[in-house]
């Protein structure tokens, strides 16, 4: 897990991701991490691995990468102490919001493509959030408009 102690980043041997959703964007994340593994490791300084994938259709995941473990219960991701970051790419408000809350309460960092999260949830609905919890917003349109990696 990435930790900051007085401005110094400490990285684990690898960063483990729990991926929620395997549609167009989620499938793209699987392919980018698989196809550019060496470059990502070089730039980040440690490997980034998808440890588990939450998917309604396991066959989609296995078509992209047969080695990825597929789960159907969010608790298998939020309860896994080895998962550092939960990447939410479900594509609909529900159950994405509930899953993100569970992940944050379990001490995971969350990356989501739901830019309008605050509008969906209302002003006070994230009052349970602690100062140590992190939500990062990813505008997935950017990924399609510009290359992530130069060859």
Residues of each region from the PLM?
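N-terminal glycine-/serine-/threonine-rich beta1-alpha1-beta2 phosphate-ribose binding loop
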Residues: 2-105
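Short glycine-rich or small-residue beta-strand-to-loop segments that form or flank ligand, phosphate
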Residues: 18-21, 111-112, 137
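Hydrophobic residues within beta-strands of alpha/beta enzymes
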Residues: 86, 110-111
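Rossmann-fold NAD(P)-binding glycine/threonine-rich loop
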Residues: 90, 95-106, 113-151
């Amino acid at each position: 897990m990435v930790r900051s102690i007085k401005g110094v980043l400490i990285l684990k041997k690898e960063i483990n991701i729990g991926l929620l959703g395997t549609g167009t964007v989620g499938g793209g994340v699987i392919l980018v991490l698989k196809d550019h593994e060496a470059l990502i490791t070089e730039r980040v300084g440690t490997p980034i691995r998808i440890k588990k994938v939450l998917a309604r259709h396991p066959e989609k995941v296995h078509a992209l990468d047969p080695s990825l473990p597929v789960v159907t219960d969010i608790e298998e991701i939020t309860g896994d102490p080895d998962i550092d970051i939960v990447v939410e790419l479900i594509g609909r408000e529900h159950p994405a919001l509930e899953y993100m809350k569970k992940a944050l309460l379990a001490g995971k960092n969350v990356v989501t493509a739901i830019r309008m999260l605050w509008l969906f949830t209302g002003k006070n609905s994230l009052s349970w959030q602690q100062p140590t919890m992190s939500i990062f917003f990813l505008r997935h349109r950017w990924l399609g408009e510009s290359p992530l990696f130069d060859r």
